[in-house]
UniProtKB/Swiss-Prot annotation:
GO terms for molecular function: cobalt ion binding; cobalt ion transmembrane transporter activity; magnesium ion binding; magnesium ion transmembrane transporter activity; zinc ion transmembrane transporter activity. It comes from Salmonella typhi. This is Zinc transport protein ZntB. CDD domains: ZntB-like_1. Zinc transporter. Acts as a Zn(2+):proton symporter, which likely mediates zinc ion uptake. It comes from the Bacteria. It is found in: Cell inner membrane. InterPro entries: CorA_cytoplasmic_dom, CorA_TM1_TM2, MgTranspt_CorA/ZnTranspt_ZntB, Zn_transp_ZntB. GO terms for cellular component: plasma membrane. PANTHER family: CORA FAMILY METAL ION TRANSPORTER (EUROFUNG) (PTHR46494), ZINC TRANSPORT PROTEIN ZNTB (PTHR46494:SF3).
Length: 327
C-alpha cells in the first residue's frame, strides 16, 4: 500500500489532524509528512464545516460509497468492509449540560492501516480520553490500537450513564416505599433514555463482536481479544438496561396504585364528613324555612339550646361511625 503525503490529508478547518509517532504519542500533521502503516494519520472533521465537506466530497483517498456515510448519512451503529478499508458508525453518550443525554452523538469513521478519518457534528466527549492519552504519550501506537481505545472509551461512558440511570431507579424505588411520587414526566424521561440506549447499544455491541471476529489486517490477535472483552462488557450493560426497563414498568404500576389509593382515601374522608354533617344540615335547613316562624325564636336560650343539640347530634353520628369501624 502506497504512502500518503501530509498535504493530501491536511484540511484547513479540521478539528485536528495528527500523525501517530508509533510510540503512543502524536504530533501535528505537516504537508511534508509521510503517512504509512508505521506512522498512521488521524484526521478528525466536523462534516458541517465547508472545507471539510469539500474534502470529503473530492478526495481520492476515500471510496465513493464512503463519502455520503462520512457526511452524516449513516446513523445506526454498523461496520462495513470497503476494499482495504473499513467503514464504522458508532454512537456515544452526549454528556453536554445544555442537551438531553438521551440524544446520542453519532461518530463515523473510515480507516485502514495508514490513516483514520473520523467525522462528527456534535462533540464526541468520549474521544477526550483518547486524545488525552495521545497527548501524554501513553496512547495507541497503530490504527488497531486506536480503534480498540476509542471503543473502550465509548463503552466506559455508556456504562457510567447506565449506572447513573440505575441509581435514579433505586432512588425512585426507595421514595415509592415512603409513598413519595416522582414529579410528572420524570419516570417517562427515564424510561425513554433506557429505550434509546437499548436501541443503539444493541447494534453497537454487534459491531464490536464483528470487529473482534473479522480478520482485519491492521488488528492483531490482542486487539481482537480486547475488542471481544469490550463487546462482552457492553452486553452486560444491555442486560442491566433490560432489567431497568422492566423495573420502570413495575414502578409505573406502583405509582398508579399509590395515586389511586390516595384518591380513594380522600374520597372516603369527604364521604365521612358528609355523613357527619348531613343530619345537622337537615335540621338547620328545616328550622330555617321560616314558613311558620322559627321554633324557639322568641326564647333567649333557643339558639344556644339548638347549637347544643347540633353538637350532640354530630357527636352521636361520629360515635356511631367509630363503633361501626368506619372511622
Amino acid at each position: 500500500m502506497e504512502a500518503i503525503k501530509g498535504s493530501d490529508v491536511n484540511v484547513p478547518d479540521a478539528v485536528f489532524a495528527w500523525l501517530l509517532d508509533g510510540r503512543g504519542g502524536v504530533k501535528p500533521l505537516e504537508d511534508n509528512d509521510v503517512i504509512d502503516s508505521q506512522h498512521p494519520c488521524w484526521l478528525h472533521l466536523n462534516y458541517t464545516h465547508p472545507d471539510s465537506a469539500r474534502w470529503l466530497a473530492s478526495t481520492p483517498l476515500l471510496p465513493n460509497n464512503v463519502r455520503d456515510a462520512l457526511a452524516g448519512e449513516s446513523s445506526r451503529p454498523r461496520v462495513s468492509r470497503m476494499g482495504e478499508g473499513t467503514l464504522i458508525t458508532l454512537r456515544c453518550i452526549n454528556g453536554s449540560t445544555d442537551e438531553r443525554p438521551d440524544q446520542l452523538v453519532a461518530m463515523r469513521l473510515y480507516m485502514d492501516e495508514r490513516f483514520i478519518v473520523s467525522t462528527r457534528q456534535r462533540k464526541v466527549l468520549a474521544l477526550d480520553d483518547v486524545v488525552s492519552d495521545l497527548q501524554e504519550g501513553t496512547g495507541p501506537v497503530d490504527c488497531g490500537g486506536w480503534l480498540v481505545d476509542v471503543c473502550d472509551a465509548l463503552t466506559d461512558h455508556a456504562s457510567e450513564f447506565i449506572e447513573e440511570l440505575h441509581d435514579k431507579i433505586i432512588d425512585l424505588e426507595d421514595n415509592l416505599l415512603d409513598q413519595q411520587i416522582p414529579p410528572r414526566g420524570f419516570l417517562a424521561l427515564l424510561r425513554k433514555q433506557l429505550i434509546v440506549m437499548r436501541r443503539y447499544m444493541a447494534p453497537q455491541r454487534d459491531v464490536y463482536a464483528r470487529l473482534a471476529s473479522e480478520r482485519l489486517p491492521w488488528m492483531s490477535d490482542d486487539h481482537r481479544r480486547r475488542m471481544q472483552d469490550i463487546a462482552d462488557r457492553l452486553g452486560r450493560g444491555l442486560d442491566e438496561i433490560d432489567a431497568c426497563i422492566a423495573r420502570t414498568g413495575i414502578m409505573a404500576d406502583e405509582i398508579a396504585q399509590v395515586m389511586q389509593e390516595s384518591l380513594a382515601r380522600r374520597t372516603y374522608t369527604m364521604s365521612l364528613m358528609a355523613m357527619v354533617f348531613l343530619p345537622s344540615t337537615f335540621f338547620t335547613g328545616l328550622f330555617g324555612v321560616n314558613l311558620g316562624g322559627i321554633p324557639g325564636g322568641g326564647w333567649r336560650f333557643g339558639f344556644s339550646l339548638f347549637c347544643i343539640l347540633l353538637v350532640v347530634l354530630i357527636g352521636g353520628v361520629t360515635l356511631w361511625l367509630h363503633r361501626s369501624k368506619w372511622l
